[in-house]
Amino acid sequence: MVPSREFFEEEMDRVLENEAQKLSLTNLLKNVFAQTLDMKPEGVLTTEEALLAWLVDECKKEYLHQLIELVMQVPVSVEAPTTSAINNSLGIIRQTHGQGEDNFGRLLCSLSFASCFLELVLQSDERCLSVFASELAKFYVESQNLWLAYSGGLSAGLRERFPRSWLYFALKQKWLRFIYFFK
């Protein structure tokens, strides 16, 4: 029996939606990491990006010692140091999400670890940042999609859990876009 045309169209729509989610999350993560690593993000950050970058910075400040210890324990291969470093650190993030119920706390811890890792091991290299953000987005879209959907998506989840901070960054980012527009 040959699958129907509708089946192929539905499958293609699902694949395209999945790829669009990955691309969107990759861009968001690149901008968040660029902001936390004092690199220039692409344009003015969105409210989600600005709030997430601030939360990651606060998490890094509070747990810097523990994060540095974790980063220094990541094994790195001599033959392909960048590739092995990225794969091993992503393995740690997968293990973090594999234990217990997922929540925004785990997301913030993972992003804080990733930010420290990018800064200390990969030395804030822009190409490594892009590869790392892409692989991390792929992990979240493929493995954590149910949790993200259940929490209403990243934007709605952040707005619900951090309402005052969300409002502050929404106003701040609108003001920055206004200023940026007139430059």
UniProtKB/Swiss-Prot annotation:
It holds the Pfam family BALF1. It comes from the Viruses. InterPro entries: Bcl-2-like_sf, Bcl-2_BH1-3, Bcl2-like, HHV-4_BALF1. GO terms for biological process: regulation of apoptotic process. Belongs to the Bcl-2 family. This is Uncharacterized gene E4 protein. It comes from Equine herpesvirus 2 (strain 86/87). The gene is E4.
